[in-house]
Amino acid sequence: MDFFNLIKNRYSCRNFSEKEIEKEKIIKILECGKIAPTACNMQPQRILVLNEKNSLEKLSSVANIYNAPLALVICGDKNSVWTRPFDKKNTLDIDTSIVTTYMMSETHSLGIKSVWICFFDPSQIKTILNIPNNLEVISILALGYSDEKTPSSDRYSQERLPLNKTTFFK
């Protein structure tokens, strides 16, 4: 499958089966995150892999992870991030989002589904998972095999703004 069709057919899955994700597939997903580009190659991503029942239950007490059998808590190390000198913008959110996108795309290519989650209180996650202060919780990528009907890839013609509303040539 070419890249365009891969991303066109990817969707946010919110119903996962109980089937565990194979260890070698988890490693491959994490490897894709490792090779994702980051500003000045600073690699500020720090990823907590939660696949044990106890850890997943703790996380699900403060964030809806849709009963996924695997959750990646994507954090950024505030001490290992590039900052643009002109306006002091740090790239922590950008870098970790690129890493997450790479992992999410690889997940789909392996037949595993995902949902990117940002609706949570980061301080609660830091507390229950004992995350150190130098790490900022950015997002959660919940992963698993789908237990729902795959939506049509034609949905984008109705759900997305036309290109001429989001892109400008000058």
Label the predicted regions.
Residues I112-Q124:
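GST superfamily/GST-like fold recognition
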Residues A68-L72, N130-S152:
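A glycine-rich helix N-cap at a beta->alpha junction
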Residues S105-H108:
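Short hydrophobic alpha-helices that are characteristic scaffold elements of the AMP-binding
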Residues F3-E20, K25, I140-K170:
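C-terminal helix-cap and adjacent tail motif
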Residues K25-V99:
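Glycine/small-residue-rich phosphate/adenosyl-binding loop
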Residues N15-F16, R46, K113-W116:
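Short catalytic-loop micro-motif centered on adjacent basic/acidic residues
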Residues R46, F120, S139:
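Residue-level "edge-of-site" marker
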